[in-house]
Amino acid sequence: MPTGDYDSKPSWADQVEEEGIDVEPLSPQIKKQDPASFVLDTPREVINGNIKTITEYKLNDKDKKIKIVRTFKIETLKASKVVAHRKNWKKFGNSEYDPPGPNVATTTVSDDVLMTFITNKEDLNNQEEEDPMNKLKGQKIVSCRICKGDHWTTRCPYKDTLGPMQKELAEQLGLSTADKEKAPGAEPEPAQAPVSKTGKYVPPSLRDGGSRRGESMQPNRRADDNATIRVTNLSEDTRETDLQELFRPFGSISRIYLAKDKTTGQSKGFAFISFHRREDAARAIAGVSGFGYDHLILNVEWAKPSTN
């Protein structure tokens, strides 16, 4: 039986098994070449807009011809002159005949590293000038006449509740707080002694208050307890200034204590207000108890005297 060297063509079943990859037998000349140079045809490039498609044919491990299609997106980036000049260098070694651009077989492309140079010298000429508007951020430019907040009076959230109540109380009392302090029944302020401007030594007996008798703090504390009221059902956003504006129309206030949470700083819902006169405290209980304030109904009553 005669024999001869001939190339066997793959069957149709083998082509389907290779999932549609073009398969061609190897010629004897190709088999003698180095496997690293098994590039059958010159890669074909097709550029469509900013999409570049490269098609080439190579041999796999089974000595079969395969088709490789690579798609690239072209992006134009601005680079410095030094970088552009470095890209035009002539390649050498295994990449001597490579096209422009990196080759994954010989080149590893990593992320760009941005370098920041820090100098010890401070450039005083490039310091940013201070914005005069930043200085006014911490200052209170606008003050509300009703709640003393940092907004206009026409935009006060308590305009419909606190404003009418203050006007009604002022009409019932018939006097403003400033007029009440000037009334005949009010205690006159003690006259201040003239201050010596000569720089000479003044004995304690001749100084301001030296001729008066010392007063004990215990009677004043008892008087405060008798004219102290307790306000409950306050909102968490209540401040001392809100209580001052709410109870000031009834009389002179000596002390305000608002219970606050140590961690959050918000109100615990109750406070103590001490008046100079018990009559003012009684009017405050009658006027504010049951009053709606900040969507809550306030409860005002006499505070229990302390046992200390």
UniProtKB/Swiss-Prot annotation:
Q: Name one GO molecular function term.
A: translation initiation factor activity
Q: Which InterPro entries match?
A: eIF3_g, eIF3g_N, eIF3G_RRM, Nucleotide-bd_a/b_plait_sf, RBD_domain_sf, RRM_dom
Keyword field contains Amino-acid biosynthesis: no
Q: Where is this region: Disordered?
A: 1-35, 176-227
* Alphabetized SUPFAM superfamilies for the sequence: RNA-binding domain, RBD (SSF54928)
Please report which protein family the annotation says this sequence is part of: Belongs to the eIF-3 subunit G family.
The entry describes its oligomerization and partners as:
Component of the eukaryotic translation initiation factor 3 (eIF-3) complex, which is composed of 13 subunits: eif3a, eif3b, eif3c, eif3d, eif3e, eif3f, eif3g, eif3h, eif3i, eif3j, eif3k, eif3l and eif3m.
Give the protein's recorded name. Eukaryotic translation initiation factor 3 subunit G-B
Tell me what organism the protein belongs to: Xenopus laevis
Q: Gene name?
A: eif3g-b
